[in-house]
């Protein structure tokens, strides 16, 4: 399973660790906040709608940040924009720790979200461009597993801070603690370079990426369906991640048991990332995503709607992490293979972050709906609808496994697959261009 890493070049390994650590940091900062929400609710007397807005606003503005970072990355390089993203969201995370009111915290979280948006699309594009097509799914899937590491660290740090410090101070220290991993990530990224694929594209006569790139009808089909797919995946994921601590608290789960439950889900997500990474290269991106989405639909329904004993809750927690979160390992390679190099991160950033911001509406939606039907029912309702939307998007997108990424040409608006230019001519099937 790790053959791809052992056979990789020094630059490929540096790129892997740079992207892995950055994604772990992104997850750490984002998930830390979800574990602080119960404390903030008590300290500032917030209602569920206000809590939902705090949880949603950073996710919504990631669309702007991701789109902007994608454009800058296509123009000025992947490596330097990855550094800028880390500095940006760490800075505003620190400032959030100094907030004196709900309104100030809302502003800092909004600005922090701009940095979050840039990390995923730019890192995914960089990885896609440096890794052998035969191993792209595995390598990018392992990068995605950094999310599980960041999540687990967030659980541990938040739990320790809330146990050792008064709640009105613990949440501030939690925001400030992001400086430590950010410094480590910046150290790792100091020698990472842009890919040869990107450099060749930048020196070619290909048109420069701009805000108008995502409006070009050549990319309309792939861009729209990719966004629909991400909306479904993110709506389900955030309905679970943001509200899970509150749900466990509502079910009177003891603090120690809550930590164990979330860690089991994080372990499940790591296993899901690894499995999805391997499967996406073995059987394809679409079958992997569809299978895990259906699995997520079933286990989420069980988790939210069934009366749970300890044993069943443990099993379902693992399976929710494995499917609902693990499936994201197949998303990075899938989207990176939809668009040509000169607009790759612009289009990926738009699809991923628009999908993320729209999908994040589930956080507010769950908060509002829970006042009428209860939190578990609200979470379950949004998750089931979300995964149905995701499957719809997947079914209408082409399979791209094994495609040589430098050969992807401009998409044909009338075709179901990207146009791929090969040494022998132009084909309209991604499968036909597999090495």
Question: Where are the regions a protein language model picked out?
Answer:
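Cytosolic juxtamembrane N-terminal segment immediately preceding the first transmembrane helix
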Residues: 1-28
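Extracytoplasmic gate region of multi-pass secondary transporters
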Residues: 34, 219-273
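Helix-breaking motifs and short loop linkers at transmembrane-helix boundaries and internal kinks
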Residues: 45, 77, 98-104, 132, ...
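Conserved MFS/SLC helix-loop-helix module at the cytosolic interface between two early adjacent transmembrane helices
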Residues: 64-100
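Structural signature of the two symmetry-related core transmembrane helices
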Residues: 80-94, 287-302
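Cytoplasmic helix-loop-helix junction between adjacent transmembrane helices
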Residues: 108-145
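Glycine-rich segments within core transmembrane alpha-helices of 12-TM secondary carriers
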Residues: 137-158, 352-362
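Helix-loop-helix hairpin linking two adjacent transmembrane segments in secondary transporters
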Residues: 143-190
């Amino acid at each position: 399973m790790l053959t791809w890493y052992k056979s990789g070049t020094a630059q490929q390994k540096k790129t892997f660790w740079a992207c892995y650590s950055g994604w772990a940091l992104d997850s750490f900062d984002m998930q830390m906040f979800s574990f602080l929400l119960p404390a903030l609710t008590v300290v500032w007397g917030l209602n569920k709608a206000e809590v939902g807005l705090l949880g949603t606003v950073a996710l919504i503005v990631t669309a702007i940040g991701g789109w902007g970072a994608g454009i800058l990355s296509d123009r000025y390089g992947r490596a330097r924009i990855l550094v800028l993203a880390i500095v940006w969201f760490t800075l505003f995370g620190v400032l959030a720790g100094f907030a004196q009111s709900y309104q100030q915290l809302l502003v800092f979280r909004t600005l922090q979200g701009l940095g979050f948006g840039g990390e995923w699309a730019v890192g995914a594009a960089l990885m896609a461009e440096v890794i052998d097509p035969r191993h792209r799914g595995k390598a990018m899937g392992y990068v995605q597993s950094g999310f599980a590491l960041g999540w687990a660290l967030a659980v541990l740090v938040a739990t320790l801070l809330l146990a050792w410090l008064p709640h009105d101070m613990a949440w501030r220290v939690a925001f400030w603690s992001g400086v430590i991993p950010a410094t480590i990530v910046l150290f790792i990224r100091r020698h990472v370079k842009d890919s040869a694929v990107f450099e060749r594209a930048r020196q070619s006569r290909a048109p420069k990426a701009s805000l108008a790139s995502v409006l070009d009808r050549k990319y309309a089909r792939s861009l729209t369906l990719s966004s629909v797919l991400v909306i479904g995946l993110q709506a389900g994921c955030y309905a679970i991640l943001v509200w899970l601590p509150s749900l466990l608290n509502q079910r009177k789960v003891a603090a120690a048991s809550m930590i164990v439950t979330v860690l089991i889900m994080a372990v499940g997500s790591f296993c899901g990332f690894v499995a999805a990474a391997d499967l996406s290269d073995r059987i394809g991106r679409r079958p992997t995503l569809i299978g895990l989405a259906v699995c997520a639909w079933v286990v989420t329904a069980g988790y939210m709607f069934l009366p749970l004993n300890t044993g069943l809750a443990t099993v379902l927690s693992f399976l929710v992490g494995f499917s609902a979160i693990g499936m994201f390992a197949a998303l990075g390679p899938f989207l990176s293979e939809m668009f040509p190099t000169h607009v790759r991160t612009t289009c990926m950033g738009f699809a991923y972050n628009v999908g993320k911001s729209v999908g994040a509406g589930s956080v507010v939606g769950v908060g509002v709906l829970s006042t009428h039907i209860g939190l578990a029912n609200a979470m379950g309702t949004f998750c089931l609808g979300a995964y149905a939307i995701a499957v719809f998007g997947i079914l209408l997108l082409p399979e791209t496994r094994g495609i040589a990424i430098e050969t992807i040409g401009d998409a044909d608006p009338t075709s179901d697959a990207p146009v791929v230019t090969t040494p022998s001519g132009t084909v309209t099937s991604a499968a036909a261009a597999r090495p």
